[in-house]
């Protein structure tokens, strides 16, 4: 099953994920993958996430949390945050494990 590591930018989620899953297929910067698929290619965020989960059932997904903080003025930036949030909700639902990373320390939330 999928494992999701999420945290703020530069909080160490990629290092922790790779340390805990050295042999697994990893997808770092998944928030940027969502940006390309949804905003550039016009895919719907949840549909993209469902397809991804079906195609990569044992993946280690690593993403930045982008939904906290000040709401961007730019509509495209707001759409990006919304798409990432919706897609990661699907991934988290499908995941066997969800770990939130702060200062390099993982806290398992699922």
Regions found by a protein language model. Give the residues of each.
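Generic detector of leucine side chains in alpha-helical contexts
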Residues: 4, 16, 39, 73, ...
